[in-house]
Amino acid sequence: MTWKIIADSGCDYRQLANPAIDTEFISVPLTIQVADQVFIDDASLDIDKMMETMYATSEASKSACPSPDDYLRAFEGAKHIFVVTITGTLSGSHNSAQLAKNIYLEEHPDTQIHVIDSLSAGGEVDLLVEKLNDLIEQGLSFEEVVQAITAYQEKTKLLFVLAKVDNLVKNGRLSKLIGTVVGLLNIRMVGEASETGTLELLQKARGAKKSLQVAYEELIKAGYAGGRIVMAHRSNEKFCQQLSELLREKFPAANIKILPTSGLCSFYAEEGGLLMGYEIG
């Protein structure tokens, strides 16, 4: 195998439907610890069970990044390797991948490895993986793919919509009072990934209908113009379909993909949440 695209489970794909020629896609899982149980975020994970377990405990759940060894095993057998990780502000996965790259290149100096901090999660990571596959399919050199994906990342963004914030409260990132208000008043948190990879709140919207309109407005305001958008959702396909209809009224040729979130992205998005990656311009 000449090429490998490797992503941690900040990416929602377990496999690519149409991998480029001589290209293999590998998902390197994070683990999620809920009370005394550890869930490995691979293709065999029962995400529903993980979420049920998470909501049944008052303890804070936490994720653990892949080790450098996990990445080293994934590197084996390819000449040209691209790695995409969840934002370094949420996980040490990017650091593990960089360390693995340095170790691997000492032993395999002819291999080419490029590690990308997505500065994001979910749908935007999915977009970067899709684009890498497209660029390799075009027959570009490794250096040309690096240049093209770097430029492409400047034109992608993440918009998130959260219907529950239990995890944020349990982990001390939101106060219990705010968490209670969100639940009682049916508040949706609408936000984005910043340029430095932190998740920032844009608006609070009350109810699904209002949050749908707010999400649409934020996409347009940010520069979405009918290009690719990946709506990664945790048990909320209805919202995705409704948002797709709104977008297609304005952009009939919009390239929209809807898919379920990985275990890790379900952990962050929570029930009813979305992590949408989209192109601007």
Residue ranges of model-derived segments:
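A short helix->loop->beta-strand "cap" motif at the edges of active sites that frequently abuts
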Residues: 110-111
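Alpha-helix initiation and N-capping motif
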Residues: 47-48, 68, 129, 142
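Mixed-charge interfacial surface used for oligomerization/domain docking
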Residues: 10-26, 30-31, 90-93, 97-102, ...
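Structural motif
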Residues: 4, 80-82, 228
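Short beta-strand segments
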Residues: 6-7, 85-87, 116-117
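Flexible, charged surface loops at secondary-structure boundaries
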Residues: 1, 75-78, 222-225
